Amino acid sequence: MGVPADDPRRTKELLAVQFIRALLGPEAPEAMGLPVPPVMTHVHQPTLDRMGELRDAVAGHLDAVASHRMWMALTSPAALRTFMEFHVYAVWDFMSLLKSLQRLTTCVDVPWTPKGTPETRRLINEIVIGEESDITSPGQVESHFEMYLRAMTEAGANVEPIKTFVRCVREGHLIHTALQKAGVPAPAQEFVLSTLDLINVGRPHAICAAFTIGREAAIPAMFLAGVRNLPADVPILKQYLERHIEVDSNEHSGLAMRMLSAFCGEDVARWHEATGAAISSLQARRRLWDAVVEKVG
């Protein structure tokens, strides 16, 4: 799904592929089935060098998530519905993670004042546009969360718990109360609460690491396995997975990596905390996938 050589998005694709190489090794993009441009330019080598220790620390955890046996367990429509009824909460809290980054890097208050660096503001706002108001089909603009709800309906999955949860949150209930009122599966509750705990601590570099490594770097490899095994009668889910493979491998991962570097700078302690947050995020994802496998039998 690479972009043409003369497309202005090519710089982002080059950066994203180099980012994945830095995290997982030089052959990783090819092994993941991601687009690899024939000539690598615009490489930010000093930034990638600083990612070296983080790369070594997270590589095994990334691989465990990317190659998880869960996708092979989704062998029936009922199993696929169970997966979606668990996974939708990761789709929802992805947006909370993203919006927390936007709040940390841009001014969302009135009256407005400049906050952060112009480049960081642009980076986060570009990602928010794509996730919160994507063009998912001609004439249709929606968030990826709303798209996922349509995919669940198409597949016959139960959307009432997630709708109840969102309604409770909108009404002002505490997150753990909303999760309980909605009857959210315990493993999905654990996943959401781990994300919200990280957000509430409020360390920008840790939040960005969870977003960059735990989500943006992991999603393309995870979803490639899913797309390959999907039945033909769930086209919206297939489109959702393919859209994330496209934007997260070609665009968003590179943008997120630049933000992570900006947050950590040359501070060794921040890089250490970022590494811990990334690993914790990947471990939470693995536990969620383990729970899906256990549920579908």
Regions found by a protein language model. Give the residues of each.
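Non-heme di-metal
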Residues: 41-297
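N-terminal amphipathic/basic-hydrophobic helices that include classical n-h-c signal peptides
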Residues: 1-37
